[in-house]
UniProtKB/Swiss-Prot annotation:
Residues 256-283 form a coiled coil. The keyword Ubl conjugation does not apply. The chain crosses the membrane at residues 150-172. Residues 345-392 are annotated as: Disordered. Residues 1-149 are cytoplasmic. Residues 353-367 have a biased composition (Pro residues). It is found in: Cell membrane. This is Anti-sigma-I factor RsgI9. Residues 3-50 form the RsgI N-terminal anti-sigma domain. GO terms for cellular component: plasma membrane.
């Protein structure tokens, strides 16, 4: 009967192996053995040790004999190993042969001769590097290198690697004390609470000087948000910041949606916070208070703090700017909240600050005729929006030739999504990320009816719903000229072109309704309607420049949202440094060809990890590779991290009727969760047919860390 385990140490001509049932056995070392390797061996290969002396035994003390089954007498307490970065930092290592103290002349290094470093890996914390150092020590545990066949169970998807890298204790370090959300309260004092998922205050910050006075003497840590809110407002009232007249209280909140669990239920979590805030305001029982609650995102919160503003004041600043008001950060800092809100609602100037007025020019006596044009070198006023010419039908038709149909298919050739896109370079097309994220195969149909296979995504941003696609071959579709959001103002006229009716272009004319959309970091609202099918298409200004990309469904308010083209322009500028053939794919899509069924097995298992689908993950492997422990590890992985698994390449190396080999490269990047180093996996797997279905039965991989 074969015994299976992982090599935990190599000493001279012996390999120390930790078996599946947690025994430690020594076998004869072979040349190809290395630490971390999974091996199988017969029971008669286990090395029998006779009368070994141990340096950790007191003078004259010995472990007389170690039998073939390596049960070392009284060797039962190697535990509580913390911060495993030093050889001698092992606690409770006191029960070797009932020894109470070590020999005086024993070395300081915690080493048992010929059997050093017996480690229960389930109790190791902060475990992040295995080194092939000749010394018997584990140091700076941030790399796993030269590990072949690291996991029988999850080598292809690196699930075991992740568990091994960080240890269960680190991965589960997601306590209720983590920063769950930020809530600011503005009367004139600006106070910010950092709360955990139980709505308990863990940090209180004074954003301005008035807030320091309010917080003085208040013990708010561990208070629930409702109570903390009441205490702050009552203190503000006692100091005269809340009077008998009408009082405005502005409450702003930002959810820390870097936390995966929080982001997945964002709307629900925001509603819970709003309810808690409402309860706090009601508990004051003060009819003079008029309160307003607003939501910002983390990026806006960071910008607010950079400008020494509360989230609420920064929100009002952005709102004023959107309405075209001439207002500065300093004015927002120094103004009363009530004045700010009322001025913005009335859309009047914040303060009677004098503005430069051009001197009056006497009216010319003779009225100039049309032929008396102003000299070109004379200063002239800018043309009003009405003076900007419309795009003509012929111009729109020419621009529309660069708009394409984007179609995503599943493995059964069924259309899963369809929308618009447009050319931004030779064989490069911009579109919405949501259109292609679930596509196994993606095709682009040009205006002339030609269909091109997409090789993959070269750039993408999930939050902004943008993706840049590269076709397998260069196309003849003319790229459009990209403009900028900076050229737009409220009321600017636009033209949107999409593929609402499949291959036929649809043209919609409208104007810029707003340069900001609630809940989105950077978006534009149009007066023109955007259909689901035309999403991903270009939005043009009256000069024919693409100033935005339509994004149907990105806003929860059902507004016609557009993402500024500036982001795509930055990508195109970066990629223009490379030839078409050297533009790297970061997220591969497949092609319906003779290799599809083999490539799809690798594609499917990696997508199962990203979709947190353990059933599909194991379904891609042979039954022999399944293990309950791996399933449990995956559950920990899925609940702790939000990882992006991006396939860069898949190629069939060899194939026959019953077996095949597929090479692949994919990356794992953290999007949310505890500390994690991103890395690239380069591997090759073997496939066999099981009841007519191709499954993975073996793989070999190399791993490298990436930025």
């Amino acid at each position: 009967m074969k015994i299976t385990g992982v090599i935990v140490r190599i000493h001279k001509d012996r390999a120390i192996i930790r078996t599946d049932d947690n025994r430690l056995l020594a076998v004869k070392r072979h040349n190809d053995m290395m630490v971390g390797q999974i091996v199988s061996f017969d029971a008669n290969e286990v090395h029998k040790v006779e009368s070994k002396k141990y340096k950790y035994a007191a003078s004259g003390k010995r472990i007389e004999k170690v039998q073939k089954t390596p049960k070392i007498k009284n060797f039962s307490r190697i535990n509580n190993i913390k911060e495993f970065s030093r050889v001698d930092d092992i606690k409770n290592f006191s029960r070797v042969a009932a020894t109470k103290e070590t020999s005086q002349d024993s070395p300081q290094e915690s080493k048992v001769e010929n059997f050093s470093r017996v480690v229960d890996f389930s109790r190791v914390m902060n475990f992040s590097r295995v080194s092939n150092s000749k010394k018997n020590e584990i140091k700076n545990f941030s790399r796993i290198s030269n590990i072949k066949n690291f996991s029988r169970i999850a080598s292809i998807a690196a699930a075991f690697v992740l568990i091994f890298l960080f240890g269960r204790n680190v991965m589960l370090n997601n306590s209720s004390d983590s920063e769950y959300a930020y809530v600011s309260v503005d009367v004139n004092p600006s106070v910010e609470f950092t709360i955990n998922s139980k709505h308990k205050v863990i940090v209180t910050s004074a954003i301005n000087q008035d807030a320091s006075e309010v917080l003085d003497g208040l013990e708010l840590k561990e208070k629930d948000l409702k109570s903390a809110l009441v205490m702050v407002l009552e203190k503000a009232e006692s100091l005269g910041y809340i009077s008998d007249d009408k009082n405005y209280v502005l409450v702003s909140m930002a959810l820390n949606d870097k936390n995966k669990k929080t982001r997945d239920k964002r709307e629900e979590k925001i509603d819970e916070l709003k309810e808690t805030i409402e309860q706090g305001i009601e508990a004051l029982d003060n009819d003079t208070i008029v309160h307003r609650t607003v939501t910002v995102d983390l990026e806006e919160r960071n910008k607010a703090l950079e400008n020494e503003l509360s989230m609420g004041r920064y929100y009002l600043y952005l709102e004023a700017k959107e309405k075209g008001m001439d207002i500065t950060i300093d004015e927002v800092k120094s103004s009363k909240i009530s004045d700010l809100i009322e001025k913005i609602e009335d859309n009047t100037e914040l303060a009677p600050t004098p503005t430069p007025v051009p001197p009056e020019t006497p009216e010319p006596t003779p009225t100039p005729t049309a032929s008396e044009a102003t000299p070109s070198n004379s200063p002239v006023e800018s043309k009003s929006p009405e003076a900007v010419p419309e795009l003509g039908s012929r111009e729109i038709e020419i621009l529309g030739e660069s708009v394409v149909l984007v179609t995503a298919y599943d493995e059964n050739r069924k259309v899963v999504s369809q929308g618009s896109g447009f050319a931004v370079g030779t064989g490069l097309f911009a579109t919405n990320y949501h259109l292609v994220k679930d596509g196994v195969v993606v095709k682009i149909t040009a205006g002339d009816g030609k269909v091109y296979d997409v090789d993959g995504i070269v750039k993408y941003d999930k939050a902004k719903d943008l993706a840049l696609l590269k076709t397998r071959v260069e196309t003849g579709v003319n790229p459009l000229k990209l403009g900028t959001k900076k050229s737009l103002t409220k009321g600017s006229r636009i033209v949107a072109i999409g593929k609402a009716n499949g291959a036929k272009n649809t043209v919609t004319k409208g104007s810029i309704k707003s340069l900001k959309v609630d809940g989105l970091t950077d978006a534009i609202e149009l007066s023109a309607s955007i259909s689901k099918e035309s999403t991903g298409g270009p939005v043009f200004d009256m000069k024919g420049n693409v100033v935005g990309i339509t994004a149907y469904g990105i806003s929860k308010q059902n507004v016609n949202a557009v993402i500024p083209a500036d982001y795509v322009a930055d990508w195109v500028k970066e990629l223009s440094k490379h030839s078409f053939g050297n533009i790297r794919i970061v997220r591969k899509t497949l092609v319906f060809d003779s290799d599809f069924e083999f490539n799809f097995v690798v594609y499917k298992i990696i997508r199962a990890l990203e979709n947190e689908d353990a059933a599909t993950y194991f379904g891609c492997m042979t039954d022999e590779l399944y293990k309950d422990e791996t399933r449990k590890n995956l559950e920990v992985l899925f609940t702790t991290y939000d990882l992006a698994y991006n396939i860069e390449s898949i190629n069939v190396v060899s194939k026959s009727e019953e077996q095949a080999k597929v090479s692949y490269v994919y990356t794992i990047n953290k999007e949310a969760g505890p500390n994690f180093k991103n890395y690239r996996i380069i591997g090759e797997c073997s496939l066999i047919k099981v009841d007519g279905t191709w499954k993975i039965n073996d793989s070999e991989e190399k791993k490298e860390y990436i930025q």
